[in-house]
From Swiss-Prot:
This is Cytosolic 5'-nucleotidase 3A. GO terms for molecular function: 5'-nucleotidase activity; magnesium ion binding; nucleotide binding; transferase activity. InterPro entries: HAD-like_sf (IPR036412), HAD_sf (IPR023214), Pyrimidine_nucleotidase_eu (IPR006434). It is found in: Cytoplasm. One of its GO terms (biological process) is dTMP catabolic process. The modification Phosphoserine is found at S273. It is an enzyme of class 3 (hydrolase). Its EC number is 3.1.3.5, 3.1.3.91. N(7)-methyl-GMP binds at E130, S151. Substrate binds at S198, A199, G200, K247.
Length: 331
């Protein structure tokens, strides 16, 4: 065989090998592509808000299924059940702690320095118990009652006038989370019921969202409301105490509200504590519930517990963009 013939045979053989290799590579690519596009976490992966390092999900498949259920149900089936302090409001801004509803009153100029010192001592004593990763909710329960009862007693002694609440809130450093206008606006636009369940001070909470322009008719607030005397001076608090770990009882007391929403069987629950997980206990017919938890403090100690109990955990996250992205697809 002459050299030209040998060269032709070699070229054909080489081409055949290349074709085989190319075919294998192409098959592998197609298989990989199909596997990627066929994964159940497709919706989550397509949402850029879920790609941030602050978003932690233990079971993406379960979250995907719940979100698909929410999307399928649409506006007709949806309701929102949410905490307020450090959930809808910010935990911090530019490295500085933002106030809770109680802190807004504690820090106002109508409270004496002596009272403020005592309130701070109570916070230092009991907050450590509230976020202790070892103690059970049942063990924390009586300490929370002590804390709230003592704090409310001190505030009553100050004789806070109702007429000053608007000014007190306006002068405070309270801030709602980034994206709050979109959150409240879209929910109002579609008539979605919003149940704000707070262990804070209801009068202050309502004034915060009123001044932010988002206290719409679809929003219901359940909280610790002040009781004023005939002169408009604080004399006590109405009803039974709501604290961070008895929201289960409060939820059951609001079954009349939830029974009116029997068709709203899909729930997005927002909270920042283990106690907030019980806020939907008064809902009888739950089809899909997505629990989103903000982990603001002691992340290393509490992350595992939050990952076990919340579907989505948002670590040191000061925005509502994750829930807003879900609402965008659902409504």
């Amino acid at each position: 065989m002459d050299r030209a013939a040998v060269a032709r045979v070699g070229a054909v053989a080489s081409a055949s090998v290349c074709a085989v290799v190319a075919g294998v590579v192409l098959a592998q690519y197609i298989f990989t592509l199909k596997r990627k596009t066929g994964r159940k976490t497709k919706i989550i992966e397509m949402m850029p808000e879920f790609q941030k390092s602050s978003v932690r999900i233990k079971n993406p498949t379960r979250v995907e299924e719940i979100i698909c259920g929410l999307i399928k149900g649409g506006a007709a089936k949806l309701q929102i059940i949410t905490d307020f302090d450090m959930t809808l409001s910010r935990f911090s801004y530019n490295g500085k702690r933002c106030p809770t509803c109680h802190n807004i009153i504690d820090n106002c100029k109508l409270v004496t320095d002596e009272c403020r010192r005592k309130l701070l001592q109570l916070k230092e004593q009991y907050y450590a118990i509230e976020v202790d990763p070892v103690l059970t909710v049942e063990e924390k329960f009586p300490y929370m009652v002590e804390w709230y009862t003592k704090s409310h007693g001190l505030l009553i002694e100050q004789g806070i006038p109702k007429a000053k609440l608007k000014e007190i809130v306006a002068d405070s450093d309270v801030m709602l989370k980034e994206g709050y206008e979109n959150f409240f606006g879209k929910l109002q636009q579609h008539g979605i019921p919003v149940f704000i369940f707070s262990a804070g001070i209801g009068d202050v909470l309502e004034e915060v969202i009123r001044q932010a322009g988002v206290y719409h008719s679809n929003v219901k607030v359940v909280s610790n409301f002040m009781d004023f005397d005939e002169n408009g001076v604080l004399k006590g608090f109405k009803g039974e105490l709501i604290h961070v770990f008895n929201k289960h009882d409060g939820a059951l007391k609001n079954t009349d509200y939830f029974s009116q929403l029997k068709d709203n069987s899909n729930i997005i629950l927002l909270g920042d504590s283990q106690g907030d997980l019980r806020m939907a206990d008064g809902v009888a017919n739950v089809e899909h519930i997505l629990k989103i938890g903000y982990l603001n403090d002691r992340v290393d100690e509490l992350l595992e517990k939050y990952m076990d109990s919340y579907d989505i955990v948002l670590v040191k996250e000061e925005s509502l963009e994750v829930v807003n992205s879900i609402l965008q697809k659902t409504l």
